[in-house]
């Protein structure tokens, strides 16, 4: 190797592998979105609405954290931690300005399966009841949260792995009907899980296939064990919550700050329970002791990761899909963009980091996001401000929640799921717009109810792909290109006789194994139809119509016209501008079209081809030695045909 070449190679290598300062800054801003918006934060315009939204969000985070921790079969205090740490991590790495990450009903329900399976309730009598050094909780409670933290950790690892593999671009298969049906079904599961608290019943943990129906069967079998006091308090709480929230919605334009009815109800119910000693007098279940402070971080137990991999995948997929839908809705509403892959990273890190602080799996929630909308939040600063108030609850106010009745907490959760439950109204929309989507919605909801949210999500995605695969090969792949515009462009440069022997076909779809044969059939049918309009039927019937070339040669195979065929050579131009991607079968079919036409004295030219298509066809069909068949535009291809025709005329004159 010469010195000049070695120097040139080393310079190229140095240029390729030496990152520039601007590249590093851009990478940091792309992976840490907070660096992009925080320096431009407008204190004067945004701080007040973000503060108000943060206070209201903190109320939601605390109530949902307590309830979803119980839903996840762990001590309520861990729900407070799950409302704190994920929100901080997402504010740094996430792109959704109105996405409130924290505890989530669907992920809590999934993680509860692992907790109840590995540390069942009957183990409480087998483990030591002495308080541990962590938060003063029993060994049983700590074993349970370690399982939930392991689910959170492994779920986060899966999400980060999906970010590395750039699988965010594959989320297009999770359509709106699938998300709507899955979240509605999961919300129905959550409501069902709260029935025992609403009725004041003691009920064993029921899960698994058809567990939804077994729960209601158990309720009806033990209907006499319902506590009337809990039922009445639940009904009163639900009525108050629904009424006040509806009034807030009606008058939100006239009042600047809505009434925090959740907070008012918590204070009133706790005070009433304390004054009347409802826990002992009426046997109402209360939240109980809430430890103060945050424990030192500790790694989740790695030895049980293999045992929770099913729940971890469910948490990773369901949590991400639900959160992404909210982030995309926020971006669409407020006119900004998000990166689907970056959301994988943000939620993955939220789950991984939080698992070291005894947190249950996290995701964004519809109720909290809607709350940020209604209170006028501008940025993730609202979530960070809410974290300050959550810290106050953890260190100071937490013990006062001891007397909060569980039936009131369950009522708050049920009413908070209203946004998901009213998605039943989407059925009318899907029925009127696309009945196949209606069928996918109903079947996905049924599978979610009968099995679980992750099973319903998987079923919905499979149904969507099956519908696409079933309909894709039947979609029209080619069409005759409008010739009027083309004639106008070329009429000053060439005679119209050239265009009479040219057929321009537009490829409208990707060419893959699903539609390769359909492409060939469509191409032949269109050309036969065009030719049938310009020739007698008797001529067509005398031709072989099973091959592409006989279609292109105008069907004139009788003796009267056979002499004119060589002089009137036809050309086929394939406009590949709508040809977005291809596979081996697609390239094989294109080469087959070319070779078939070549053997029948028909020229096939391709316009608007990508470099990858040219390379693939050249390699597959060994076209290196062929005359030019690839052109940058349809006009260039027609000009090539016209030039060849003029050369042919000159050749004929010279022979004469």
From Swiss-Prot:
Residues 492-641 form the STAS domain. It comes from the Eukaryota. GO terms for biological process: iodide transport. The keyword Transport applies. Residues 97-146, 192-202, 249-254, 328-343, 426-448 are extracellular. The chain crosses the membrane at residues 76-96, 147-167, 171-191, 203-223, 228-248, 255-275, 307-327, 344-364, 384-404, 405-425, 449-469. Its main location: membrane. InterPro entries: SLC26A/SulP_dom (IPR011547), SLC26A/SulP_fam (IPR001902), STAS_dom (IPR002645), STAS_dom_sf (IPR036513). Gene3D superfamilies: STAS domain. GO terms for cellular component: apical plasma membrane; basolateral plasma membrane; lateral plasma membrane; recycling endosome membrane. It catalyses: chloride(in) = chloride(out); iodide(out) = iodide(in); bromide(in) = bromide(out); oxalate(in) = oxalate(out). The keyword RNA-binding does not apply. Residues 641-656 are annotated as: Membrane targeting. Residues 1-75, 168-170, 224-227, 276-306, 365-383, 470-656 are cytoplasmic. It is a multi-pass membrane protein. It is found in: Basolateral cell membrane; Recycling endosome membrane; Apical cell membrane; Lateral cell membrane. GO terms for molecular function: chloride:bicarbonate antiporter activity. It holds the Pfam family Sulfate_transp. Keywords: Anion exchange, Cell membrane, Endosome, Ion transport, Membrane, Transmembrane, Transmembrane helix, Transport. Belongs to the SLC26A/SulP transporter (TC 2.A.53) family. Acts as an anion channel mediating the transport of chloride, bromide, iodide, nitrate, sulfate, gluconate, thiocyanate, oxalate and bicarbonate ions. Its permeability towards bicarbonate is weak and increases when pH is above 7. Mediates thiocyanate transport in retinal pigment epithelium cells. Mediates iodide transport in the thyroid gland, playing an important role in the synthesis of thyroid hormones and the maintenance of thyroid function. This is Anion exchange transporter. The gene is SLC26A7.
């Amino acid at each position: 190797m010469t010195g000049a070449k070695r120097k040139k190679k080393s310079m190229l290598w140095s240029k390729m592998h030496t990152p520039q300062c601007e590249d590093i800054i851009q990478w940091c801003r792309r992976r840490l979105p907070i660096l992009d918006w925080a320096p431009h934060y407008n204190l004067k315009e945004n701080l007040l609405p973000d503060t108000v939204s943060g206070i209201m969000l903190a109320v939601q985070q605390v109530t949902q954290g307590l309830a979803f921790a119980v839903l996840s079969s762990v001590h309520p205090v861990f729900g407070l931690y799950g409302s704190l740490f994920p929100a901080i991590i997402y504010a740094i790495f996430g792109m959704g300005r109105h996405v409130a990450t924290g505890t989530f009903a669907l992920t809590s329900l999934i993680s509860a399966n692992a907790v109840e399976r590995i540390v069942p309730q009957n183990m409480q009598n087998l483990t030591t009841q002495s308080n541990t050094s962590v938060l003063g909780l029993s060994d049983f409670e700590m074993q349970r949260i370690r399982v939930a933290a392991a689910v959170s950790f492994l779920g986060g690892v899966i999400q980060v792995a999906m970010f590395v593999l750039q699988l965010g671009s594959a989320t297009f298969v999770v359509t709106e009907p699938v998300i709507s049906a899955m979240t509605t079904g999961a919300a129905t599961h959550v409501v069902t899980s709260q029935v025992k608290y609403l009725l004041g019943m003691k009920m064993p943990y029921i899960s698994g296939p058809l567990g939804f129906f077994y729960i209601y069967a158990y309720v009806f079998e033990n209907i006499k064990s319902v506590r009337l006091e809990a039922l009445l308090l639940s009904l009163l709480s639900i009525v108050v919550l629904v009424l006040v929230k509806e009034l807030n919605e009606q008058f939100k334009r006239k009042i600047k700050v809505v009434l925090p009815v959740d907070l008012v109800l918590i204070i009133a119910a706790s005070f009433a329970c304390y004054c009347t000693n409802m826990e002992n007098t009426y046997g109402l279940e209360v939240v109980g002791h809430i430890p103060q402070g945050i424990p030192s971080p500790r790694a989740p137990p790695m030895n049980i990761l293999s045992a929770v991999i099913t729940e971890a995948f469910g948490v990773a997929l369901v949590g991400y899909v639900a959160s992404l839908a909210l982030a995309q809705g926020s971006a669409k509403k407020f006119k900004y963009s998000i990166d689907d892959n970056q959301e994988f990273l943000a939620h993955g890190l939220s789950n991984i980091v939080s698992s070291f602080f005894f947190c249950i799996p996290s995701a964004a929630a519809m109720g909290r996001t809607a709350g940020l909308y209604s209170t006028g939040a501008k940025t993730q600063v609202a979530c960070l401000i809410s974290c300050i108030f959550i810290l106050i609850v953890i260190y100071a106010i937490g013990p006062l929640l001891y007397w909060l009745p569980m039936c009131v907490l369950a009522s708050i959760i049920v009413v908070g799921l209203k946004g998901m439950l009213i998605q039943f109204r989407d059925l009318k929309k899907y029925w009127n717009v696309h009945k196949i989507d209606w069928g996918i919605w109903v079947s996905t909801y049924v599978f979610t109810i009968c099995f679980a949210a992750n099973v319903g999500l998987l079923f919905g995605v499979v149904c969507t792909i099956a519908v696409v695969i079933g309909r894709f090969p039947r979609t029209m792949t080619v069409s005759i290109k409008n010739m009027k515009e083309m004639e106008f462009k070329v009429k000053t440069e060439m005679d119209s006789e050239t265009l009479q022997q040219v057929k321009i076909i537009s490829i409208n779809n990707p060419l893959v194994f699903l539609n390769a044969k359909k492409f060939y059939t469509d191409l032949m049918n269109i050309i036969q139809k065009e030719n049938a309009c310009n020739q007698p039927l008797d001529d067509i019937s005398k031709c072989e119509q099973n091959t592409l070339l006989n279609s292109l040669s105008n069907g004139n195979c009788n003796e009267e016209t056979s002499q004119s065929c060589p002089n009137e050579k036809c050309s086929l131009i394939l406009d590949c501008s709508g040809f977005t991607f291809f596979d081996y079968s697609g390239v094989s079919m294109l080469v087959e079209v070319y070779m078939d036409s070549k053997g029948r004295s028909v020229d096939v030219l391709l316009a608007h081809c990508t470099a990858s298509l040219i390379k693939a066809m050249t390699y597959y069909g060994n076209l290196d030695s062929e005359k030019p068949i690839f052109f940058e535009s349809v006009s260039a291809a027609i000009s090539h045909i016209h030039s060849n025709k003029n050369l042919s005329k000159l050749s004929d004159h010279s022979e004469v």
